[in-house]
């Protein structure tokens, strides 16, 4: 039916998640800037002819707009908001309630009293919070319930949703007569309501609540199981989005100073052993200052070198962790420095037969990258660097490679320019054909085949994969917004696999697909 309704006549309900039900939690969604994403969707909808009366200039104005109207936050509701809010009358809900199967009516009565209950009830009517924007109703999903343990209720397979929860969807579907709903972000509660796991019936609350209303669901590509639940039990068409941007944690202040002291200690073991006791005291003091004395404990009965190795490895692991640097905005590909970091993130592990960039560049020194990580206090003799410092050098080289490709718009000339770099040419002369120290964790990757590729061949392979596959697919992130428009206009939404692109799954891209699970 959607493709036969003019855009200007379509009614669309946009439902933000709101758990716990406070104004400060409006728009919660794993890794997604939900508010800015929907603000941009409103722009796109208006351009396509949907009736959108106003578009907030930014996320702050959007939230201010939503909280001027009724929300789920009962502590913030005032008389004006209560009076102006949409409501469903006791009779309207009662007529619907009496169509439910008898066991459903009895459970609702047991859990939440006689219809219409007392949750979000106002003079015998049930509140429907939200803000009307032309033919777009922007609202928040009602709480599953209230009580001493709301988190338990959220996923409870036994506790019925409140009368107001059911009435909320009834109002959207049957009274306001929405043509479609969009659930925003990972994840809401509708697909977790009581009922059968598959093959739902009229006695199952997801079906009872949503019925036949088309359901578009913006979902994080990495959360496979819950997404499949939304499809199977909520009849949702998913619009998968990229995870939040990430970068290496790195070090700061005390950790940076401690790391420098440890590297000095390793070098002094060979050059100035008389200074080691004083340097050991400085390492212990700095570790305590950085609050690491409980994370890595020093046992005086054991050699200090054992403690130093453990501390070195701990900090090396810590600084190489991936941390979130912000939220993803639906339809916005990573750009500039963010693109550099994202491409590095997507190539830090092997992608099938494509060797990781980290592993490739570690190979020029004859080492497995993970061996370096696990033995960060050892010395790489040719450069007189600790493995920790060598890892930093490899990281800088990874970024340099990607930036050269960026500067050449990911064209073939960029790959050629990488291969012409003096340090690359020098590495090609010195690098062994195979990793000599530390077995690769990934088994038969491109660096350890029966007929091993040269260092230059491996590097060219990674660069080619970045330029010809990863980068073009990342730029198709714009499909995430287009998918919603396609869905609202009754067009087919292309399927795609789900998983973590950064865990050797760069081939899962592009996003903006109706994802399915893969083994």
Regions found by a protein language model. Give the residues of each.
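Ligand/cofactor-recognition surfaces for anionic moieties
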Residues: 1-519
């Amino acid at each position: 039916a959607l493709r036969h309704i003019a855009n200007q006549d379509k009614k669309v309900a946009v439902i933000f998640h709101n758990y716990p039900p406070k104004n400060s939690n409006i728009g919660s969604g794993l890794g997604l800037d939900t508010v800015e994403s929907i603000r941009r969707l409103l722009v796109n909808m208006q351009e396509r002819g949907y009736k959108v009366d106003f578009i907030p200039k930014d996320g702050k104005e959007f939230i201010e707009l939503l909280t001027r109207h009724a929300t789920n936050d009962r502590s913030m509701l005032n008389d004006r908001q209560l009076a102006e809010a949409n409501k469903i009358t006791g009779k309207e809900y009662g007529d619907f309630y009496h169509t439910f199967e008898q066991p459903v009516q009895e459970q609702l009565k047991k859990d939440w009293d006689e219809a219409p209950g007392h949750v979000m009830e106002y003079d015998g009517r049930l509140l429907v919070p939200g803000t009307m924007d032309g033919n777009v109703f922007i609202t928040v999903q009602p709480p599953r319930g209230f009580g001493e343990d709301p988190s338990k209720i959220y996923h409870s397979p036994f506790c019925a949703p409140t009368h107001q929860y059911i009435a909320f969807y009834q109002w959207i579907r049957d009274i306001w007569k929405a043509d479609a709903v969009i659930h925003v972000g990972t994840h809401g509660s509708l697909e977790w309501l009581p009922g059968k796991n598959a093959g739902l019936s009229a006695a199952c609350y997801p079906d009872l609540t949503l019925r036949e209303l088309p359901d578009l669901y913006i979902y994080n590509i990495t959360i496979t199981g819950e997404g499949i639940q939304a499809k199977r039990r909520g009849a949702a068409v998913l619009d998968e989005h990229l995870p939040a941007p990430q970068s290496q944690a790195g070090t700061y202040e005390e950790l940076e100073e401690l790391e420098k002291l440890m590297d000095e200690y390793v070098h002094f073991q060979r050059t100035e052993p008389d200074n080691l006791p004083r340097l050991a005291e400085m390492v212990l003091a700095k570790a305590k200052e950085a609050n690491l004395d409980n994370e890595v404990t020093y046992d005086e009965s054991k050699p200090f070198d054992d403690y130093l190795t453990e501390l070195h490895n701990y900090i090396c692991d810590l600084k190489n962790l991936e941390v979130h640097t912000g939220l993803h905005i639906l339809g916005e590909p990573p750009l500039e420095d963010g693109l550099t970091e994202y491409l590095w993130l997507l190539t830090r592990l092997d992608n099938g037969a494509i060797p990781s960039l980290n592993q490739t560049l570690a190979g020029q020194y004859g080492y497995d990258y993970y061996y370096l990580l696990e033995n960060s206090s050892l010395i790489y003799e040719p450069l007189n660097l600790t493995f920790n410092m060598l890892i930093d050098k490899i990281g800088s080289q990874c970024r340099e490679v990607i930036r050269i490709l960026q500067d050449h718009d990911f064209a073939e000339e960029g790959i050629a320019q990488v291969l012409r770099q003096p340090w690359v040419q020098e590495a090609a002369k010195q690098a062994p054909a195979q990793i000599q120290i530390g077995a690769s964790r990934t088994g038969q990757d491109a660096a350890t085949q029966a007929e091993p590729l040269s260092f230059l061949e491996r590097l060219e392979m990674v660069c080619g994969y970045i330029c010809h596959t990863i980068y073009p697919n990342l730029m198709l992130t714009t499909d995430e917004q287009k998918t919603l428009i396609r869905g609202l206009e009754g067009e087919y939404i292309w399927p795609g696999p789900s998983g973590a692109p950064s865990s050797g799954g760069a081939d899962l891209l592009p996003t903006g697909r109706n994802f399915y699970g893969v083994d």
